Amino acid sequence: MSNKKRSASSSRWLQEHFSDKYVIQAQKKGLRSRAWFKLDEIQQSDKLFKPGMTVVDLGAAPGGWSQYVVTQIGGKGRVIACDLLPMDPIVGVDFLQGDFRDELVLKALLERVGDKKVQVVMCDMAPNMSGTPAVDIPKSMYLVELALDMCRDVLAPGGSFLVKVFQGDGFDEYLREIRSLFTKVKIRKPDASRARSREVYIVATGRKL
C-alpha cells in the first residue's frame, strides 16, 4: 500500500471513529473506550457477571471491559487484567502489564489468580493489524487459542468464556473446540461493533467438568 493510499485510509478511519455515536457517548460518560457498550449489550443478553465473581481480562487496555465489569461484580469481586500496553489504574482491578505470550508473564498472571478458580475469562486481544486478512487472521487465532488454554487452566466448572474472534480461516475449528469445552455457545455481534468489521464475540457458558 502506498503512503498516499494509507494516509487516505487512515483519514477515513479517524473521521469514522470520531463521528461514531458510541465513541461520542463514551467520551461524554468518561468511559475508557467504546468497548464498554459492547460488553454492556452482551451482559444484558447473557448475564455473564454477578456480584462477588473473579474475572480474568486478557487484552484489557485501555480498560473499557474492566471498567464495566467492576460495576457488575461489586466490591467483593475481583478483576485480574493483563495487557502488553499500559493501563491507568481502576479500583477493583489488579493489572499486570506484559506480553501474555511470554512464559514469565503468564506465570505471573497465574500467580495472581492463585489456587482458586475464576468464574469468567474474557479476551478482547487483537494483534497489530496490517489490513491483510491472510496475515491478520492467523495472528488473531493464535491469541484466542492461548486464551482458551487459559480457560483450561483457571476457569471453574460452570464458568464462562467471552472472546473476540475475527471470522476467517480457523474460525469454524476454533468454534468446535470451544463447543467441546462448554455446554452452551453463542455468537454475538453487538450493535457497538462496526458493521464492516470481521469481529464477532463468542459467548461460551457452562464450562464442562
Curated annotation (Swiss-Prot):
GO molecular function: rRNA (uridine-2'-O-)-methyltransferase activity
EC number assigned by the record: 2.1.1.166
Enzyme class: transferase
Localization in the cell: Cytoplasm
GO cellular component entries: cytoplasm
Superkingdom: Bacteria
Active-site residues (renumbered): K164
Chief location of this protein within or outside the cell: cytoplasm
Key words of the record: Cytoplasm, Methyltransferase, rRNA processing, S-adenosyl-L-methionine, Transferase
Matching Pfam families: FtsJ
UniProt keyword Transferase present: yes
Record carries keyword Methyltransferase: yes
Binding site for S-adenosyl-L-methionine: G63, W65, D83, D99, D124
Catalytic activity: uridine(2552) in 23S rRNA + S-adenosyl-L-methionine = 2'-O-methyluridine(2552) in 23S rRNA + S-adenosyl-L-homocysteine + H(+)
Family: Belongs to the class I-like SAM-binding methyltransferase superfamily. RNA methyltransferase RlmE family.
Function: Specifically methylates the uridine in position 2552 of 23S rRNA at the 2'-O position of the ribose in the fully assembled 50S ribosomal subunit.
HAMAP family: RNA_methyltr_E (MF_01547)
NCBIfam families found in the cross-reference section: PRK11188.1 (NF008390), rrmJ (TIGR00438)
Protein's UniProt name: Ribosomal RNA large subunit methyltransferase E
Origin species: Yersinia enterocolitica serotype O:8 / biotype 1B (strain NCTC 13174 / 8081)
Gene: rlmE
